[in-house]
Design a protein with these regions (language model features):
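N-terminal secretory targeting modules
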Residues: 1-34, 38-61, 116-117, 167, ...
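Generic structural signal for well-ordered alpha-helices
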Residues: 107-111, 158-162, 205
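Serine-dependent acyl-ester chemistry module
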Residues: 128-152, 180-202
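Catalytic His-Asp segment of secreted/periplasmic serine-dependent ester chemistry enzymes
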Residues: 22, 77-78, 179-276
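Second-shell loop/turn segments in exported
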Residues: 37-41, 143-152, 194-195, 244-253
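C-terminal outer-membrane/trafficking sorting elements
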Residues: 280-349
């Protein structure tokens, strides 16, 4: 854990320091944070509050625990139990669950904080709908209507909610907050034979990428900025369990280190939106055992690490924004390349 923390804080701290030396475009902005229990956190361990405080933003955290996005995530066998489902109206909830309906979790209530004074809406959802997302992924690219408004699908529910946000705040910037791990087997229930059933959170990240492209909104690719995985390419350990002791929430780390790392990563990702060091420029072209980067800020440090955390080689982006780093001369296996803030996993065969 110490090596993970040290490496992550060095990488993120370097970029955050650069950002602090520049003008802060987020200072004074009014931000509404929409999400699940992960951004809701607990008092004293809430990363949206840390992000807002450090960037000088005025925050309204409207994340709600156990909040789904889509009615399609409410399993038929559990439909009698009240669910928090953001895309449902209060009337729809009352019709399904009567007096016990959690109407506070309807978009009609949550979005009351979104108005003409709102500058930014952070949309931090996905994990709770992971099973539905996993089912939808296979057909997304072959379905021309996948992003049509439909509250029974995940993508369609997001389309509905984005539309509702824009009705209330046409000039606000919607930003998708990516999930923090693209390699975690997340529990979704029990099979008929009594064994546990899982889906990989890589699907959540893939859905967020697809949605960002379809909706033309920025995506904070947090999973690239944190080494949080069931099997870390940097350390070989289960860093997910270290980051989330309860297997779901970073705020379950009572030391507060995970929440601080999460906030650092989000600040870093928000900084990328304003400096040009964004996802497309930090994803290299791989050819003949060499990673080729372009569009990086001059002087950006690009480094190659072994899975045990050893630094093998470094290079800096030239005045044209290009950087090249070779890994083909090393033994077959998995390596990690950091480019500024991004973490890219590569395999040398």
């Amino acid at each position: 854990m110490k090596r993970l923390l040290l490496l992550a804080l060095i990488i993120i701290g370097y970029i955050t320091t650069i950002f602090a030396q520049q003008s802060n475009p987020y200072s004074g902005k009014n931000i509404v944070w929409i999400g699940t229990s992960i951004p809701a956190g607990i008092p004293g361990r809430q990363y949206p509050e840390l992000v807002a405080k450090r960037l000088g933003m005025n925050l309204k955290n409207r994340a709600i625990g156990a909040s789904y996005i889509s009615m399609g995530s409410i399993k038929p066998g559990n439909s009698l139990d009240p669910h928090s489902c953001l895309s449902m109206t209060k009337a729809e909830m009352k019709k399904m669950w009567g007096a016990s309906a959690p109407t506070h979790a309807s978009f009609e209530e949550v979005f009351k904080e979104i108005n003409s004074n709102t500058d930014i809406v952070i949309f931090d959802h996905g994990y709770n709908d992971r099973e539905l997302i996993d089912k939808e992924l296979a057909t997304l690219n072959n379905n021309p209507h996948a992003f049509d408004i439909d509250k029974n699908t995940y993508a369609g529910s997001v389309a509905f909610l984005f539309n509702e946000i824009r009705k209330r705040a046409p000039h606000a910037k919607i930003i998708l907050a990516g999930y923090f791990s693209d390699n975690h087997e997340a529990w979704i229930g029990v099979n008929a034979d009594g064994t546990s059933k899982y889906v990989n959170t890589k699907g959540v990240c893939q859905m967020q990428e697809w949605l960002a492209n379809k909706a033309q909104v920025p995506l904070l690719r947090v999973w690239e900025l944190l080494d949080v995985s069931d099997h870390s390419p940097l350390t070989g350990r289960n860093t997910f369990k270290e980051f989330c002791p309860d297997d779901v929430h970073p705020h379950s780390d009572e030391s507060g280190r995970s929440i601080k790392m999460y906030a650092d990563a989000l600040i870093n990702a928000l900084q990328q939106l304003t400096t040009g060091l964004n996802a497309p420029t930090t994803r290299p072209t791989l050819q003949n055992g060499t990673a080729h980067f372009s569009g990086l800020p001059t002087g950006t440090l690009v480094s190659l690490y072994a899975t045990d955390g050893r630094l093998l080689h470094s290079a800096k982006a030239n005045s044209n924004g290009d950087a090249h780093i070779s890994f083909g001369q090393y033994p077959a296996g998995t390596y990690v390349i950091t480019a500024g803030s991004a973490i890219i996993k590569v395999v040398n065969k």
